[in-house]
Regions:
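ASCE RecA-like P-loop NTPase motor cores
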Residues: 1-124, 128
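Short, ordered, surface-exposed loop/turn motifs in non-cytosolic proteins
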Residues: 130-133
Length: 133
């Protein structure tokens, strides 16, 4: 257990959050924390439960920052990137983001992750099937 987790375990607020997570009361949320504070709390939750985390952030920049912070505390943190937006017709488009997303899904299927971080933009992304119909 890291020293950060040891300190958080003494907190009543963290104990309440951990209890909610343990009893299956999901989703679990915490407000009022700094970006680094969020990473520390998520890391402590992971250390307590040893279950992979799915973390939603308000935007892509927050997702990238939180992923970097979590990676310094624990390994195998995945960032599920948003789709690349193309507003003009182009002759050739890069499939880099599609490949990155497929890599994350592949690693999730293999169980090779401790947390997946994604932004809320994924919830509002239309699917290709919805666009076709």
């Amino acid at each position: 257990m890291s020293c950060f987790s040891g300190i958080l375990n003494q907190s009543d607020a963290f104990a309440s959050l951990n209890r909610a997570w343990t009893t299956g009361s999901r989703p679990v949320g915490a407000v009022g924390l700094s970006e680094t504070g969020k990473a520390l709390v998520l890391h402590a939750l992971y250390e307590q439960q040893r279950k992979p985390l799915l973390v939603l952030t308000p935007d892509e920049a927050s997702a990238v920052k939180l992923t970097e912070d979590l990676r310094t505390l624990q390994g195998d943190v995945l960032l599920y990137p948003a789709r690349e937006m193309n507003f003009v017709q182009v002759a050739g488009a890069s499939h880099e983001y599609e490949l990155l997303r497929l890599d994350v899904l592949s690693r999730m299927a293999a169980g090779a992750y401790t947390a997946v971080v994604l932004s809320l933009i994924h919830i509002s992304e239309p699917t290709r099937l919805a666009l076709i119909s």
